[in-house]
Design a protein with these regions (language model features):
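Carbohydrate-binding surface patches
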Residues: 45-48, 53-55, 89-127
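Flexible loop/turn segments at secondary-structure boundaries
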Residues: 21, 54-55, 61-65, 113-116, ...
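Glycan-recognition surfaces
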Residues: 1-53
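C-terminal beta-strand-rich structural cap/linker in extracellular carbohydrate-active enzymes
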Residues: 144-164
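Catalytic cores of secreted or luminal carbohydrate-active enzymes
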Residues: 40-88
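Hydrophobic, well-ordered secondary-structure elements that form the walls
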Residues: 106, 133, 156
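Generic recognition of flexible, low-complexity loop/linker segments
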Residues: 31-33, 92-97, 148-149
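Solvent-exposed beta-hairpin/edge-strand motifs
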Residues: 123-138
Length: 164
């Protein structure tokens, strides 16, 4: 990415997309994404600082989808972080990071169609002297993380952390 630019991921087609989707055939009114894929999409938009332009039908939005697009910790990364940095793609796992306030936000993506376990080595991210790791989607701190974070990812899923 060049300075002064950002990846514009465009609209967030999450949840129900329209009131009458009969013209869409089998897909109907639904986005066609699994819950994990919806979370991955929101994580990607957040770490890229792309505009969070919701493309779903608000009147039909389920609680899960609403929890994704209104998560204040994820929105904070989207609104207040620096330019994202691609870290690596190894064995179907892609990692991006960005600086925010007094920590580093890290997004881990499973690009494969299989479940994938990954050990996120904090030294690979240039992070030392870890005080805390926070799971942004669970909105909880992860206990006892010093040198790495073990991640178990379903197909096409992601995890999103802040590391202090």
């Amino acid at each position: 990415m060049k300075d002064g630019s950002f990846p514009d991921c465009d609209i967030l087609p999450l949840g129900k997309l329209c009131i009458d989707g009969s013209y869409m055939g089998d897909m109907g009114r639904d986005s066609g994404f699994t819950k994990e894929e919806q979370k991955t999409m929101m994580t990607l938009w957040a770490v890229f600082r792309s505009p969070l332009f919701f493309g779903g039908e608000l009147r039909l939005t389920d609680n899960y989808t609403l929890s994704l697009v209104t998560n204040p910790e994820v929105i904070n990364v989207n609104q207040n972080s620096e330019k994202p940095l691609f870290v690596y793609n190894k064995g179907g796992i892609a990692v991006w990071q960005t600086k925010i306030e007094n920590c580093t936000a890290v997004a881990v993506f499973n690009l494969s169609d299989e479940e994938n376990r990954h050990k996120l080595k904090l030294s690979d991210l240039g992070i030392e002297n870890v005080r805390a790791v926070r799971d942004l989607w669970a909105r909880k701190d992860i206990p006892k993380c010093e040198n790495d974070v073990a991640v178990s990812l379903k197909p096409h899923s992601s995890e999103f952390f802040e590391i202090y």
